[in-house]
UniProtKB/Swiss-Prot annotation:
Keywords: Ribonucleoprotein, Ribosomal protein. This protein is located at the 30S-50S ribosomal subunit interface and may play a role in the structure and function of the aminoacyl-tRNA binding site. This is Large ribosomal subunit protein bL19. HAMAP family: Ribosomal_bL19 (MF_00402). The gene is rplS. GO terms for cellular component: cytosolic large ribosomal subunit. The lineage of its organism: Bacteria, Bacillati, Actinomycetota, Actinomycetes, Frankiales. NCBIfam families: rplS_bact. InterPro entries: Ribosomal_bL19, Ribosomal_bL19_CS, Ribosomal_bL19_sf, Translation_prot_SH3-like_sf. Disulfide bonds: none annotated. GO terms for molecular function: structural constituent of ribosome. Belongs to the bacterial ribosomal protein bL19 family. The keyword Ribonucleoprotein applies. SUPFAM superfamilies: Translation proteins SH3-like domain.
Amino acid sequence: MHTLDSLDAESLRTDVPEFWPGDTLKVHVRVVEGNRQRIQVFQGAVIRRQGGGVRETFTVRKVSFGVGVERTFPLHSPIVSKIEIVSRGDVRRAKLYYLRQLRGKAAKIKEKREPVAR
């Protein structure tokens, strides 16, 4: 293992759930305003995951008051306090940039149906 890899391994988070593009997430973000600190929740669909290791990022898209909002978060950053999976999406692409042009029902992602154990 290289020296940089061993340094990076120390700062990797272990509490990150397994999620993919198409999944709907609630990202709890730590916001600092002056000397106060609060948690803000950003809920939307994951449109991409990029990079690897410490530098891995993911982008979440939501529509707020008719305007599309996208935020890119570093996966292992301390400003992301918690990631919750709301629902699993069924998509065939790794990058869902095409959602930017779609409106209304067309921009909806199908929910993945899990098989029931018998």
